[in-house]
Amino acid sequence: DPCQVKNFEQAIQENTKLIFIETLGNPNSNIIDIAAVAQIAHAHKIPLIIDNTFGTPYLIRPIEHGADIVIHSATKFIGGHGTSLGGVIIDSGNFDWKASGKFPQLTEPDPCYHGIRFCDVAGNASYIIRIRAILLRDTGAAISPFNAFLLLQGLETLSLRVERHVANALQVVDYLSKHPKVEAVHHPSLPQHPDNKLYKRYFPKGGGSIFTIDIKGGIKEAQRFIDSLEIFSLLANV
């Protein structure tokens, strides 16, 4: 259970290289105490990597709470229109990869890049520099110029869109939480959500626009509900 911070401490072994969490969990928008998990990670000299796709840079900035690396699927809220594929890796530059002693690919000579030691060349930025120098070259995971343009264009309206997403979600959540045919609604803004206290601490601008519901009557009623939707679409992606 990732919501119990002590479980991270107990799960760490000698070969553990990192801790990975989400700012808002999929699908029930669970929230983990980022600062507490960051403290555990750093005590064991491993980085905390956070997926902030659902949280978005507008609602929360994980690096300010102790995250070392933040990733996004930019296809979702950053792009905002479902038109382009892309991802983002943000390195805080705060983690000391050399002192960790767990990352020989950063501290030992790299034979495929002239024998350099990335930690000696780039210091705390060695992780992100190696991604650009080695992984980007070897895998070809370079975004197309037009997709990059669309994502940059999406960033211009991110705050306005997410603000409206959150406002709309809260209205729907409020309505559904009172509906007689709904068993439960899962969104951190609700007092009954198990992570409501963390929501108030980490998400002053709102806890995102993703929520789930439990329909009374089981799977058949849930299917009937989905088939009856007129405004919302049934999709495999966010």
Regions found by a protein language model. Give the residues of each.
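Conserved C-terminal alpha-helix-loop-beta "cap" of PLP-dependent enzymes
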Residues: K181-V238
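Conserved PLP-enzyme active-site core in the AAT-like
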Residues: D1-H179
